[in-house]
Amino acid sequence: MEDAQEQRESSQAELAKKHPLTPLKELPEESEEEEEEEDESSAGALRESDSNNSIMGKMKMRVSSILPASLSGWFSPSSKDGNDALSSPANLRQSQPRQSNGRLTTKRKRGRRRIMLAEVDADAADDLDDGSDAKGLNYEEVALADNIAEHDLAAEDEQTRRSEYNVFLLRKRAGAVAAAGGDEDEAEEDELEEDDEDGDEEDDDEEQENLQQSAAVQTKRRRLELETPVNLPNMRRLPLLSSTPAAPLAAATSSSSSQMYKGVSHIAPHRRNHLNLYGSQRQREPAYNFFTGNEAAEGSTGDLPHSIRRSLNIPFGGSSTATSYNNSLSSLPNHKRPSLIGKQTHRRDLTMDETGTGPAMSSEEHLNHLLRISRTNNNTSNNNNNNNNNNNVIETKTRRSELSAAAGGCGDSQSESDMNEYHDNGEGHDGLRPSHYNSNSNLEFYGNLQSSKSIFNRSNTAAQQSHRNSTWSLNSLTQRRRFNASIYGSTSALSDSRLLSGSASNSGSASASSSPFYQGRTTFGGNSGNNRLFSRSNLSSSAASSMLGLNSAGSSPAHQLHASMTGGIGYGMKAVDMRPSDSGSLAETSVGQGGSKKPGTGLSNTTMRILNLLESYSTPLIDAKRMGSSIKEHQSSRQQRQGTPATPYLRSTSASRNVSVPNHINELAELRSNKLLVPTMQQLLERRRLHRVTQNSRDVVHSQNVRAGGENNQEKPKPTAPYVAPIDQSANHTQHTNKMRSRLSHQTRNKETRTAEEEAPPPLDLPQISFPDMASAPKFDLIIKPTVPVVSKPSTTDPIQSSKSSNTNLSTTNSKQMPNFLANPQPAAPIVNFAANGNVSAISKPSKRTFTFSEPTPLSNFQENCIPKPKINRKYTFSAPAPLDDLRITNKQSQPTINGTPSSKEWECDTCMVRNKPEINKCVACETAKPVASAAPVQAPLPPSTAAIDTQSFVGFGDRFKKSTTAWECDACMLSNKAEASKCIACETPRKTVAPKVNNFSPLITNAKSNEWECSVCLVRNKVEVSKCVACESAKPGATMALPATSNIAVATPSIITDGFGDRFKKSATAWECDACMLSNKAEASKCIACETPRKSSTPIANSSYPSINNNLPAGSGFDISFTRKANMWECQTCLVMNKSSDEECIACQTPNSQARNSNSESALISSISSSSASFSGSLSRPSSRSSSGSTSTCGSVCSGSIVSISSTTESAKALSAKKVPPKPDAGFQQLVAAQKTSTWECEACLAKNDMSRKTCICCEQMMPEAFNPAATTANSAASSVPKFRFGFSHVKEVVKPSVETTTTPAPTSAQFSFGFGQSNQGKDVADSKKTEAPKTFMFGVSKVEEPKTVSFGTGIKETTATSSTEATAPTPAAAAPAPVQFVFKAPTTATTASSLTTTISTTSNAPALGGFSFGAPSSSSTVSSSTTSTSANPAAVKPMFSWSGAGSAVSSTSSSQQPVAKAPTLGFGVSSSTVTTTTTSTKVFAFTPASGLDPAAATSAPAAGAGFSFGSQSKPATTQNTGTFFFGQPTAVAPATPTNPSVSSIFGAPATSTTASTSVSATTSTSTANAIASSFAPTSTPQLFGNWGEKKTDLTTFGASSGSGTTTTPSFGWSSNGDAAKSNSAAVGSAAVPSSSASTMATPIFGSSSMFGPSSSSNNTTSTSTTSLPFGSAATTAATTPAGGNAALTGLFGNVGNSLAGVGAPVATTPAATAAAPLTNIFGNPTPVAAAAPVFGSGSTIPSAGFGAPAAAAPLAAPALPGAFNFGGATAATPAASSAPFVFGSSTNEPLAKPSFNFTGSAASSTAPAPAFNFTANTAATNNPSGGDSTPNANALFQFSATSTAPANIFAFNPPAAGNSAQSSQTARRKIRAPVRRLPPR
């Protein structure tokens, strides 16, 4: 042991040398002696005590030597005892916690350490005065002080916390010390006391000096000894018990009190001591110094920095003996429930005597010591705070005197030191309970835990006494392990501190009643009425002191006992009453009055402490029970509120409460307390309401029951008045001005005032009122009539009661009988009657109730005889109501009552159901004649069930809707007509002679009519004359059809209401159902009226049957007849419009009359989908090219079929064509339309009506369609067919009869864009007489292709038979003049003379068919304008106008005498996979720019079919170039080139600058070479649409990609399709550029075709590739093709600059060297850089400036360019043979470089193509690239959104090029864009 001590001494000396900064020096005279004494005494004590010498001491020394200094210093609770520790103030501060922990044995070790420290600091020993101070020093403390002064010890915090709270070890050690015996303790305590007395004088000065010295920086020193083994698991955050604010007073009182208590220092371990709870050095955090107002001064004293972390400040008065303290030191984790009887008695002096301090000091001396300590401590902590110190000391002295007086008055003989300590909380240790009488370790430990930053740490104790508020407890809620309802928003929690401390019922604490929100006591609503426990008279100092112990776990631990001068006022709540007691006297007995009475007269102190401990110990169950009990505890307060009239919240004494509160009130309060255990705000309000209303009412009832006489009732208001509104008295509320209460009570006061006002009228004398009918006849008029027993009892006594009493009676009685209706105690009449407005005057005189829905029943006056007067006989039964009175009956007769029962005398109009007087013969509303059988028929058939009903008074509501017997119902429109009406007033259907039906409801259900027959299918009753059911058209059983022809026509008028509504939708027996579309068709229909599917196994009814049917039908034979064909009408099979029989074509869609066509047998248009080709919906008019063999219908793609019907012209269609279409009914309208039509023709572009004499539209100058102008077509020259712009169904008349032989190429009928179902008559191919081609118009879905009936939905693989190709061998020599395609919304069916197929043009001549805007497939029969080239005729495919992807006019100029059948299957939406043995050019439609006409340059190359709108890639034959770019406005210019793979540029922003022909978006012409099987979805070298934005890709499968062999189609859905250069013929989409010298027809596509909307179709130079500029951006400009295959620059519209890049090694076209293919200038800002043309909308098309004012530039060698109709400024280049495009908005047709009208941004520059504005993505290719080199795209176009442009002019290009000549350089400035900066949110 001594060896270890020597080692410690040596190590400490070394540390002292190492750390010279330890300022705590010990006086030389004291140091040696005292330390030796201390060592000896402590050693002796250790030897005496226990095995502590051997076990504890050695273990501690060893552990301390093992552990590092930081750990040992923190963990070893310095165990030196109070003699040494308390000798000097500095030591006191360090040893106080240790001593309060009661470690007696550790004194020796401390003494040893002090001796060692004194030796170490011997040089500075003379600074100290006496040994007592030196003994107070502890090396651990000094080292810790050094550590704290120098460092924050952040790393050691956790270990410190753990060791600091290691109560278990400390208790263990203390237990060992306690076992050693009390003799040594007493001796040490005596020694400590002596030291204390000696050092009293010196403490003040020396402590400050020592503290300053210690505050001087002291280096860290290892603590060589750890006095207790460190058990880290036990040291982790032991649970804290009390949240009492930290008490700096511990330090203040350290020296005196600890000396006074020699063995046990009860000074709380203040942080300033640097000792933790167990005497070991504390953490660096000082407790809040409550003595000093200046916290900063503490920093200068070397104090620990303030920390929010709560620190433990155990009150020094916690326990007197070491043993008791040992118990209180039980570690919290292992803490057993402390004994209910605390170790300490309530008498501090006795405790001191027990601990050996009794003889040493009196309480006065103790107080002096405490004052001295506090003063010294204050001086030490802050030299500058002398004023504060003095004030604190003065206050302490003052309170000491007060406390001494109070304690003297107490029987408890509580020491003043306790009171002083406790009341020095604000100064010394705010929140320490100096006298925890029944406190255990939990209480002390938790009671002294508080936040250093607590806002309630107040240095002014006087203020604290008055300002103790629940926020203290709220602040420490987290510190207590107990449920606190205040956290959870309970109203009673904040208002009612009872819940803040469940323990506080028996022992009051001021905090319990203090409000957290305002100064003063917490009260519900601002009043303290709910808090019965706060009363100075109720609380005694002893109870308060006992409450102090509970306060740690009790009500509000932060609230100290503010003992006032009178004996300590315990601001605590009483504990739960553990014994039966009178609620009134409980407060008095349990809480002593005035300090003269001990707490709990019937309970001993031990019992009280036990109960308090039980109460303080918290478990969830206890907390839950406590909440309920706390409510019960306040029954007395509630009783007082309820009973005290004047001051419900001010209760003087329980006796006065008992006097004022009746017994039943107490009972009710008890009852409510049981009901409302935990009152919510709603419950509290309800309780208040019940108190006002229900209880008062019950009281009144009770009083009335007790008192028999009315005079008693008159006297009743006196006792009743408090009950009526005890809470509502304004005077009472003015006294309590707290916020919540005053607010709530204010409402109550208002109610009370209103109640008083309402009482002014005379009282309601209910007893005189009797309601005999109340029980028997309930009323539905919302009038609650009080029954007689309700009021009779109180009222019989005296009708003249005082207003208040009578009102009270009313409310009471009603509350008992109708409690739900009592919302408030207002005793007005409305309680009984909802209708009453609360005025009693209404009851004083007889008045009618206001809210009755019928005749108001007058309330009787005071006479009872008035009651039976209103006889309410109305019964709400559905039978006839009994008449209430004569007046009502008369009114009911004269007028239907509200329930809708008409008077029997009135007659009801069967038409409009208006009831008319009997004398009126016509309905006043609809003038329908009065029924003949007026009332008798109506009444007679009434079933017996209705006989009981009083017919006069009640007629069913449904009767109003019954038909009149005389009225007859129109079978067509179901409208009831008057009997005299011969025909229906609505639809004029003639009346049928049917016997009038009896207007009964029941017979309809029960009895069958003799004159009706019931349909066995739909159970609908039909009239006898009807041969078939009107609903399902089932034949009448057992009856032959009277009208065989009309059997399937619902001629029979539908029966009246008897016929079910659903019967009309039932299938007729004769009708047949279409297998394709499931539509029921009439029996005579040979094919489905919707999808034209032929009827299976049914011979078609002769058309003659239709007229016979119609002739047999009576006029106006019913509603169904309106849907039947008239005799002289025929129904268009395409649009189902009825046409006159004289009309040869449909007036709506211009589909030829199938009958007429069948008679001609030229083209069977009634093509129903055969079984091979599935029809999806109604068939559109399709040209049936019988001779054409490879017609394919691909659903949604190639077929120009309507969306509704996929009709492919098949053999069945041919068979059907033989039969005549029956004439349609409704001839009048048709004739009118026909007459108008014959006299006028409608411009399909602008829909203007023009006189037949005009050949052009008067509005838009669109040329007259061939349909109106058959003469326009020339026999030998293929007149450019103008597709008609029709929103309806485009119908192209076949101008040429099939009889016409070859050599006459009929003007190619332009496929018309018909949104509906348009039939397009194909121009007969003169060259191939066998083939008739009817261009199909705008089939949304699929057009039926004739022979190879292959209906492919996704990909139309066109298998064209070799026959067509063989027949296609003979090209027509006649030069094909380009037919201008008109702007037709319907797909223009360009009838190719050569190919008769609508969609797939299987023509002998190589005429690519351009499908006009068939969403699926354009049935564009390309009119092969067989322009005789040198070797072969180059048929110019007529471009459909405004085919959304209208197949570009694939102009197949086969220079060699090849006969590739250019079959243009327009694969709509999908794929036109044309597997044609011969080269078929299928132009897909639905490209907004029609497919560019392909120009097979090589002789071998067949014309590429531009597949319109292939989402994916289009397959092209390698030889021919397929330009099917799905441009919405971009024409793909196919430059004549060798059949090398054309690179397809995908649109949508990436201009695919592919040398090959760029396929316009939807008009991607996929030309498959002969024997090239175009397998759809086969990879083609076409960049995907949508996918590659300008990226050139090969082998893309289009959406339904028609894979052509070796052909690269650029399906560009992007805006720019770069016109390919060399290899492919650069034909603009929709413009057929024929490179051969022969006139190249250029159909300007509408909206997509450059020809429309201002794409100027410019005839190019010598090779005369006519390039059409596409409107809307993608102008496929055929670059001027050099002889070596010059690139045609295709400028896409909408910023789509089509770069026609000259393909390297582009083969020379067979035509003479085409120097420059005229580039198509895309309109809308797509400049075609090739020719100098002012681009429309900023796109300068080089030669032809297309669109909106772009002048048409005449190419040097002008092939006849097909001018696009409806060019918005697109000037058609004036080619020698070019027909001027009709209605170019600003284009001068023939002027070579006309200024573009509507040239919004395009400048008509001759040489340079101005950059197109709005060039969304099109690249303008550099125009003049003589050789096959790529042309540089001109990017000057504004709005080239993703166009790759070399010029920087593209402002909106995502990366506009920095350099380059821009036509619009002024717009090249880029917008500044701020670099993105992340904005961090504020911290």
From Swiss-Prot:
What keywords does the record list, in alphabetical order?
Chromatin regulator, Chromosome, Cytoplasm, Cytoskeleton, DNA damage, DNA-binding, Membrane, Metal-binding, mRNA transport, Nuclear pore complex, Nucleus, Protein transport, Repeat, Transcription, Transcription regulation, Translocation, Transport, Zinc, Zinc-finger
Mostly located where? nucleus
Write out the ranges of the repeats annotated as sequence.
Answer: 1287-1288, 1315-1316, 1317-1318, 1340-1341, 1353-1354, 1415-1416, 1469-1470, 1511-1512, 1528-1529, 1548-1549, 1586-1587, 1599-1600, 1613-1614, 1647-1648, 1653-1654, 1672-1673, 1694-1695, 1724-1725, 1737-1738, 1748-1749, 1768-1769, 1785-1786
Binding-site positions, Zn(2+) 4: 1074, 1077, 1088, 1091
Annotated zinc fingers (RanBP2-type), start-end: 903-932, 962-993, 1009-1038, 1067-1097, 1126-1155, 1237-1266
Gene Ontology annotations of biological process type: chromatin organization; chromatin remodeling; DNA damage response; mRNA transport; NLS-bearing protein import into nucleus; nuclear pore organization; positive regulation of transcription by RNA polymerase II; protein import into nucleus
Identify the PANTHER family for this entry. NUCLEAR PORE COMPLEX PROTEIN NUP, NUCLEAR PORE COMPLEX PROTEIN NUP153
Tell me, how does this one assemble? Answer: Part of the nuclear pore complex (NPC). Associates with male-specific lethal (MSL) histone acetyltransferase complex.
What name has this protein been given in UniProt?
Nuclear pore complex protein Nup153
Organism from which the protein derives: Drosophila melanogaster (Fruit fly)
Gene that encodes it: Nup153
